[in-house]
Design a protein with these regions (language model features):
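Amphipathic, low-complexity, repeat-rich surface-exposed segments
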Residues: 1-179
């Protein structure tokens, strides 16, 4: 896998620095932001604690019904997965609001920041990790890990096909005919 040039990473840092500058340039604004996020996390913790003792508790936040990543029923029925999901959604919502509500940022920088936040939050979604995705965890346990072995084999094949660069296959190339 080829590393990204440092200039791309520095561009992300510069963009996020402009957003952070707005939020951190005023102590009251920064404190208000921290208080809001802290309250959201404490509310989530309280909801999780009530559920643990058998009480019904309304979720702090729910995924969009169109978000296919969280359709498995265990995202709601299993307290661990439900907590991880809500924590992710609250954090993602906050990150998007930071960009949306930052004042004094030019439209181009805001668009870049929105794009970067979307990419990062999608990358860290609990649905992307074995231990925090109920479907993948179930399949891993049921197949004794064979699903992970197959996935790693396919990853190695994709890297080999790209000669060191990840070249993700989107279909079976043996079925394709030039013509």
């Amino acid at each position: 896998v080829i590393d990204k040039p440092p200039s791309e990473v520095s561009e992300v840092i510069k963009t996020f620095s402009k957003v952070a500058e707005y939020w951190l340039s005023d102590n009251a604004r920064a404190a208000e932001l921290q208080t809001k996020l802290g309250k959201a996390y404490l509310d989530l913790w309280g909801t999780a604690a009530r559920r643990m003792v058998g009480e019904q508790a309304k979720p702090a936040i729910e995924p969009s019904p169109r978000d296919k990543r969280f359709q498995d029923p265990e995202w709601k029925s299993n307290q661990f997965f439900d907590f991880v999901l809500q924590l992710y959604l609250l954090t993602t919502q906050c990150a998007h609001e930071l960009v949306k509500n930052a004042e004094g940022i030019d439209p181009h920088t805001r668009k870049k920041a929105e794009f970067y936040v979307q990419q990062i939050t999608n990358a860290i979604a609990p649905s992307n990790f074995v231990l925090t995705n109920p479907e993948v965890l179930r399949e891993t346990l049921a197949s004794n890990g064979d699903n992970l072995v197959r996935g790693m084999k396919m990853l190695a094949e994709d890297i080999e096909a790209g000669r060191g660069t990840l070249r993700i296959r989107q279909s079976d190339p043996s079925n394709l005919v030039v013509g």
